[in-house]
Swiss-Prot record:
<dbReference type="InterPro" id="IPR024759">
    <property type="entry name" value="UvrB_YAD/RRR_dom"/>
</dbReference>
<keyword id="KW-0227">DNA damage</keyword>
<dbReference type="InterPro" id="IPR041471">
    <property type="entry name" value="UvrB_inter"/>
</dbReference>
<dbReference type="Pfam" id="PF12344">
    <property type="entry name" value="UvrB"/>
</dbReference>
<comment type="subunit">
    <text>Forms a heterotetramer with UvrA during the search for lesions. Interacts with UvrC in an incision complex.</text>
</comment>
<keyword id="KW-0547">Nucleotide-binding</keyword>
<dbReference type="Pfam" id="PF17757">
    <property type="entry name" value="UvrB_inter"/>
</dbReference>
<dbReference type="GO" id="GO:0005737">
    <property type="term" value="C:cytoplasm"/>
</dbReference>
<dbReference type="InterPro" id="IPR014001">
    <property type="entry name" value="Helicase_ATP-bd"/>
</dbReference>
<keyword id="KW-0067">ATP-binding</keyword>
<dbReference type="GO" id="GO:0006289">
    <property type="term" value="P:nucleotide-excision repair"/>
</dbReference>
<dbReference type="Pfam" id="PF00271">
    <property type="entry name" value="Helicase_C"/>
</dbReference>
<dbReference type="InterPro" id="IPR004807">
    <property type="entry name" value="UvrB"/>
</dbReference>
<dbReference type="GO" id="GO:0004386">
    <property type="term" value="F:helicase activity"/>
</dbReference>
<keyword id="KW-0234">DNA repair</keyword>
<feature type="binding site">
    <location>
        <begin position="46"/>
        <end position="53"/>
    </location>
    <ligand>
        <name>ATP</name>
    </ligand>
</feature>
<dbReference type="GO" id="GO:0003677">
    <property type="term" value="F:DNA binding"/>
</dbReference>
Length: 703
């Protein structure tokens, strides 16, 4: 890489109350040995519930290499990222997915002469996490990034991004106004009133900025032209969190370009425009030429005056200084050369990565042909599969059902079949289609009586909805789940199933990879003998796996004949089950039910309240308001917080005042959670923890 930032080299450490067990020690050892011996592609075939996530974390700890983990969708990426943050709390675990909550790409339909403007809704929190991932990668080696295929899309050059980075330290000579100009050049905006992420404000000799990848603000205090002090502070309360002798501040956009680079880009865009206009006019496409001239001239003016324009990514080839046809810079370019790639659910993710380029290219080709974009817009694209392979090194493929591609690359798979809990793969029962609904109803009632749950998978949406209506009429608490159900509702339904508010979910293709439901003891597969994508060997194995987290897990396939896919799935499940039974008998293990916490923000609040109460009962009970009076507590204005902080410093009993502040912030945390401001509640929780740590130190010191 062409930039020079010294990365902090901190060891990867897994912090877990558990040790590797079952097949995990053998799998970790074999994976690590193969990678250390230089094998480029290694496959871990891990049965559902065997702890593939923990195995991956221990593998990273063993290899001590920065790691990229690619997931097939945002939901699984978020789930895995949360698990890794628990397993590696002291390392930089980042989340990198598309920041669009809604995205309608720019498109043109020639048949109806319809132009569709790009329309999108950006999620600010996800954008912050993307910037946090790139900032971590450039400053630390102990990085794990959990991403989706978003990581193969263009992102601007790491050299330019790092080159525009600002390094500040106490005692440094820099003029305040020069610093403000640097912030503007890095695409930060000045806003002295609404102080939010990506903005800075000035108060006399004090400059405050919230980097686009941070939740805390940075305060830079000047004495003349010298930086006197640097601190991080809570942007809401104004409380100083920590003193920072030095800081790195990265640009507010990944598509940032210096003056020289921008000047060169403007020149090459004009040259390409002139050439393309001439070409279109020779072909008699006057309308297309006029359209392209008007749109590109406007974009050039915006780039000249502001440094950015709508759809700036379409000019990324010029801004990066790349040759025509060359691949874009992506997140992969931000990693050190020795990074490890882990592809989770590889049977889904590998084809997904390979398919991204063509879909993007066909849409852009139409835009270019009809004068909506310059031909260089074609180079703002995802990586092609061969380009992706050139940029990655050693790869671990994880799946319960590895695809033919990865099986063909690897010299035998590493198996992880034995579960640490001793749980077995479910029994499989094949029953005739005739009378299947009444038989299913009887099985569901038996599960409901035992306080267990059931999943039913159908082939069509209509069938899912009709079956749901039928079960509802017979008093079963049931909901359906298919592609028309939005993501938030999907998460809510799965939570309701785990809590027992509903007993059955009927779905189509959504009950497969990564669904972690220990309460489910029955999985019913209707029309199991209808061959196709939803009833292939891999789909059946994944669906069967949903019942593998319960001691009494059973799978019922309703079919009049046994297809080849069914036979393979049954044989593989029986093979795994026999191996698991033999291991349990040899080691005297009784299968234990998997107890998985139903995570909730209320759990976090309750846990924090217990800890706070225990601490404050040590002599600070009169501080603040008595009892739980968090309803309606206003959030502190930053100015009031500054005043409050000064009062605490002047007070004769600092510990007492600190306890008072902890109570106030606890009340604010509850208020934020009730208003569904979970990000704010989490920030307040973190600050409360810091203050409690300080109070404990004071108590221990006898203050």
């Amino acid at each position: 890489m062409g930039f020079n930032i010294e990365r902090v080299d901190k060891p990867f450490v897994v912090k877990s109350p558990y040790q590797p067990s079952g097949d995990q020690p053998k799998a970790i050892e074999e994976l690590a040995t193969r990678i250390e011996n230089g094998e480029n592609d290694v496959v871990l075939m891990g049965a559902t519930g065997t702890g593939k996530t923990a195995t991956t974390a221990w593998l990273i700890e063993r290899l001590q290499r920065p790691t990229l983990i690619i997931e097939p969708n945002k939901t699984l990426a978020a789930q895995l990222c949360a698990e890794f943050r628990e397993l590696m709390p002291d390392n930089a675990v980042s989340y990198f997915v598309s920041y669009y909550d809604y995205y309608q790409p720019e498109a043109y339909i020639p048949q109806t002469d319809t132009y569709i403007e790009k329309d999108s809704n950006i999620n600010d929190d996800v954008e912050r996490l993307r910037h946090q991932a790139t900032a971590n990668l450039l400053t630390r080696r102990d990085c794990v990034v959990v991403a989706t295929v978003s990581c193969i899309y263009g992102l601007g050059t790491p050299e330019e991004y790092a080159g525009r980075m600002l390094f500040l330290k106490e005692g440094q000579q820099i003029n305040r106004d020069d610093l403000l100009r640097r912030f503007v050049a890095m695409q930060y905006k000045r806003n002295d009133i609404a102080f939010t992420r990506g903005t800075f404000r000035v108060r006399g000799d004090t400059v405050e900025i919230i980097p686009v990848y941070e939740e805390l603000a940075i305060r830079i205090e000047f004495f003349g032209d010298e930086i006197d002090r640097i601190s991080t502070l809570h942007p809401l309360t104004g409380d100083v969190i920590a003193h920072e002798p030095q800081v790195h501040i990265f640009p507010a956009s990944h598509y940032v370009a210096g003056p020289e680079r921008m000047e060169r880009a403007l020149k090459t865009i004009r040259e390409e425009l002139d050439g393309r206009l001439s070409e279109l006019r020779k072909q008699g496409k006057e309308l297309e030429a006029q359209r392209l001239d008007m749109r590109t001239t406007y974009d050039l003016e915006m780039l000249t005056q502001v440094g950015v324009c709508s759809g700036v990514e379409n000019y990324s080839r010029h801004l990066d200084g790349r040759a025509a046809g060359t691949p874009p810079h992506t997140l992969l370019d931000f990693f050190p050369d020795d990074f490890l790639l882990v592809i989770d659910e590889s049977h889904v993710t590998v084809p997904q990565i390979g398919a991204m380029y063509e879909g993007d290219a066909s849409r852009k080709r139409t835009l270019v042909e009809h004068g909506f974009r310059l031909p260089s817009a074609m180079d703002n694209r995802p990586l092609k599969w061969p380009e992706f392979l050139q940029r990655v090194g050693q790869t671990v493929y994880l799946s319960a059902t590895p695809g033919d591609y990865e099986l063909g690359l690897s010299d035998g798979v590493v198996e992880q079949i034995i579960r640490p809990t001793g749980l077995l793969d479910p029994k499989i029962d094949v029953r005739p289609v005739k009378g299947q609904i009444d038989d299913l109803l009887a099985e569901i009632k038996a599960r409901v009586a035992r306080n267990e749950r059931a999943l039913v998978t159908t082939l069509t949406k209509k069938m899912a909805e009709d079956l749901t209506d039928y079960l509802l009429e017979r008093g079963i608490k049931v909901e359906y789940l298919h592609s028309d159900v939005d993501t938030l509702r999907r998460v809510e339904l799965l939570r309701m199933l785990r809590e027992g508010k509903i007993d059955v979910i009927v779905g189509i293709n959504l009950l497969r990879e990564g669904l972690d439901l220990p309460e489910v003891s029955l999985v019913a597969i209707l029309d199991a003998d209808k061959e196709g994508f939803l009833r292939s060997y891999r789909s059946l194995i994944q669906t069967i796996g949903r019942a593998a987290r319960n001691v009494s897990g059973v799978v019922i396939m309703y079919a009049d004949e046994t297809t080849e896919a069914m036979r393979q799935a049954i044989d593989e499940t029986d093979r795994r089950r026999a191996k698991q039974i033999a291991y349990n008998q040899e080691h005297g293990i009784d299968p234990k039910p998997l107890i998985k916490k139903i995570s909730d923000v209320n759990d976090m609040l309750a846990k924090e309240d217990v800890d706070t109460q225990t601490l404050l009962e040590g002599g600070y009970r009169n501080a603040g308001k008595a009892g739980n009076t968090h309803l309606g507590v206003p959030v502190l204005d930053p100015n009031e917080a500054d005043k409050r902080h000064e009062e605490i410093l002047k007070a004769g009993l600092p510990a007492q005042d600190l306890a008072d502040l902890i109570r106030q912030l606890s009340e604010q945390m509850h208020t934020a959670a009730e208003q569904l401001q979970f990000e704010l509640a989490a920030r307040l929780r973190d600050e409360i923890r810091d203050l409690k740590k300080e109070l404990r130190q004071m108590t221990e010191a006898g203050q």
